[in-house]
């Protein structure tokens, strides 16, 4: 006699699929899901830290209730601050980056206090085009140990914001072969600067002297850029001093060439009246204008 096999309620789905392969795969998936452990939900970082903290302190013997409560509040607050700081340092957002840049700009304009002209706030304000020019000037170096960005800028800006801010000294580093050669000697600030062009200022007012002769302009010769010429001499000398001009001769020459209303002409007639001679200019006859038709018909003027 064969024993009858009974199927449990969990395996009743095994008979729903007609195909054997489908039934077997369904059966295995059910078995795996029953045997696999349940997934626990992830706890929040804050909850996990606080729960572990309370478990540790619950094992310890009870002390005075007032002191314990105050201590627990301080510890929980400290843990919350640490967790908040960890979350803030993990990700860099756009707002955090903007705040950092604003801090850097403020320290560039206010907090750099050194004797270098290139690091001064006046130099920073004079550069109107780009901030990159200001940072490029900080690549200059007084000695070959470090440049101005590493010595001054890092001290007053980067390290003031974060003490762990690290910078690499490129002056002591050899240039690699695959980079374009740059003569780094150009970045060295000269120690001896010639100030001969600048006027030396007296420290005390009593030491100042004034020469009155240099202010008075008597017997002062003007400095000229052009060489001596006739046009330059005309400024000081009267024109036509060395040239004698006869005005009558000039007027007579004009009357001979053209009719001059201010002088006598050959066409004038002299008339005596009451012992005076008067020059009268005869009237001109108006010539009749002959047209083209009259010329063809040979019409006389009279």
Swiss-Prot record:
Keyword set, alphabetical order: Meiosis, Nucleus, Phosphoprotein
Disulfide bonds, paired cysteine numbers: none
InterPro entries: Monopolin_cplx_su_Mam1 (IPR018847)
Annotated GO CC locations: kinetochore; monopolin complex; nucleus
Subcellular locations according to the entry: Nucleus
Protein modification: Phosphorylated by CDC5. This phosphorylation is required for the location to the kinetochores during late pachytene.
Stretches that traverse the bilayer: none
Composition bias type Polar residues, residue spans: 257-268
Region feature Disordered, mapped onto this chain: 53-83, 257-276
Domain of life of the source: Eukaryota
Any GO BP annotation: meiotic sister chromatid cohesion involved in meiosis I
Pfam annotation, one family: MAM1
Protein role: Component of the monopolin complex which promotes monoorientation during meiosis I, required for chromosome segregation during meiosis.
Subunit structure: Component of the monopolin complex composed of at least CSM1, LRS4 and MAM1. The complex associates with the kinetochore during late pachytene.
Entry protein name: Monopolin complex subunit MAM1
Gene encoding the protein: MAM1
């Amino acid at each position: 006699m064969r024993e009858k096999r009974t199927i449990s309620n969990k395996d009743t789905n095994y008979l729903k699929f007609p195909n054997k392969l489908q039934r077997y795969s369904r059966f295995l998936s059910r078995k795996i899901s029953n045997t696999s452990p349940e997934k626990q939900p992830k706890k929040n970082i804050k909850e996990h830290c606080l729960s572990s903290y309370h478990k540790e302190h619950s094992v310890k013997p009870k002390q005075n209730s007032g002191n314990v409560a105050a201590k627990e509040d301080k510890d929980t607050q400290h843990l919350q601050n640490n967790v908040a700081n960890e979350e803030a340092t993990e990700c860099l957002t756009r707002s955090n980056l903007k705040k950092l840049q604003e801090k850097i700009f403020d320290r560039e304009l206010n907090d750099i206090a050194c004797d270098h002209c290139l690091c001064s706030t006046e130099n920073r304000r004079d550069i109107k085009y780009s901030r990159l020019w200001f940072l490029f000037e900080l690549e200059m170096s007084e000695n070959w140990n470090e440049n101005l960005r590493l010595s001054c800028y890092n001290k007053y800006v980067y390290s003031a914001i974060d003490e762990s801010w690290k910078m690499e000294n490129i002056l002591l580093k050899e240039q690699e072969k695959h980079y374009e050669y740059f003569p780094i000697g150009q970045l060295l600030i000269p120690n001896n600067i010639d100030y001969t062009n600048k006027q030396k200022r007296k420290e005390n007012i009593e030491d100042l002297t004034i020469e009155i002769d240099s202010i008075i302009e008597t017997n002062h010769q003007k400095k000229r850029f052009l060489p001596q010429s006739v046009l330059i001499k005309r400024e000081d000398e009267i024109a036509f001093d060395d040239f004698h001009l006869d005005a009558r001769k000039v007027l007579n020459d004009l009357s001979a060439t053209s009719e001059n209303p201010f002088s006598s002409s050959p066409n004038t007639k002299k008339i005596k009246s009451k012992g005076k001679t008067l020059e009268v200019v005869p009237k001109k006859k108006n010539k009749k204008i002959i047209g083209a038709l009259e010329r063809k018909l040979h019409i006389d003027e009279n």
